[in-house]
Design a protein with these regions (language model features):
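N-proximal helix/coil linker or "cap" segments that precede and/or mark the start of modular domains
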Residues: 1-9, 184, 190-192
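Short gly/ser/thr-rich secondary-structure transition/capping motifs
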Residues: 9-14, 134-138
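A short beta-strand-turn-helix
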Residues: 10-27
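Residue-level signal for beta-strand positions within conserved beta-sheet cores that form or flank
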Residues: 25, 56-58, 151
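Soluble periplasmic/extracytoplasmic beta-strand elements of cell-envelope proteins
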Residues: 28, 61, 154-156
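Structural alpha/beta surface segment adjacent to cysteine/selenocysteine redox centers
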Residues: 30-31, 35-115, 119, 185-203
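C-terminal cap of thioredoxin/glutaredoxin-like
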Residues: 45-49, 111-203
């Protein structure tokens, strides 16, 4: 059996990225995502659980990959997240958008902005002026040409592309393998979940 090709991240995480968790964390999980993508929507609670279980042992990074042809509202949703980020509320908006990804119209975005506590005048101005559009499009171009991202979610763990299922068991296994120094001690809840999920998969 041939060994799967290892695909490495070319554009490393920088201060421009939206990152949650310490830079010193032993594992960094990066997601290329799309707020309108149903697969990303399904992955969202799984990734949230991974982040909760690992705490400061994980750094989570999100990069936009809107696909307007198949997800026509994904680009405006990405702009809304960036506008929220300019007011230090990126992650709050990130959660709102994924929780309500079936409702991403202009009025919906404004409502979520109010819900997370943004300055609504500033948010409306940034959205009307497409303040973050060029940045999102440039990042998308780099994702396509440098990383060869073709769909979402695309996940990297410690700069190596993850090709398994986007479920808790698979991600925790991959994170454990990526923790070369053995610094992560999975909490009891994570170990229990891995055992239960493993039994379920085996039937």
């Amino acid at each position: 059996m041939s060994t799967p090709e290892v695909v490495r991240l070319k554009n490393s995480v920088t201060e421009r990225d939206h990152a949650s968790g310490p830079e010193t964390a032993p594992v960094t999980l990066l997601e290329y995502g799309n707020f309108e993508c149903i697969h990303c929507g399904r992955a969202h609670p799984v990734l949230k659980e991974v982040r909760k279980l690992l705490g400061d042992n994980l750094r989570f990074v999100f990069r936009h990959f809107p696909t307007v042809r198949t997800h026509p509202r994904s680009l405006r949703a990405a702009e809304a997240a960036e506008a929220a980020g300019a007011q230090a509320k990126f992650w709050e908006m990130y959660d709102e958008l994924f929780l309500h990804q079936a409702a991403l119209g202009e009025n919906d975005l404004s409502r979520y902005a109010g819900r997370v506590g943004l300055d609504l005048e500033r948010f409306a101005r940034d959205m009307a002026e497409n303040r973050f559009l060029r940045q999102i499009e440039a990042d998308h171009e780099r994702s396509v040409f440098d990383e060869h991202v073709t769909g979402t979610p695309t996940i990297y763990i410690n700069e190596v592309r993850y090709t398994g299922a986007t479920n808790l068991e698979g991600l925790l296994d991959a994170i454990g393998r990526a923790d070369a120094e053995g610094r992560i001690q999975l909490p009891e809840r994570a170990m229990w979940l891995r055992r239960v999920l493993g039994r379920l998969r085996r039937g």
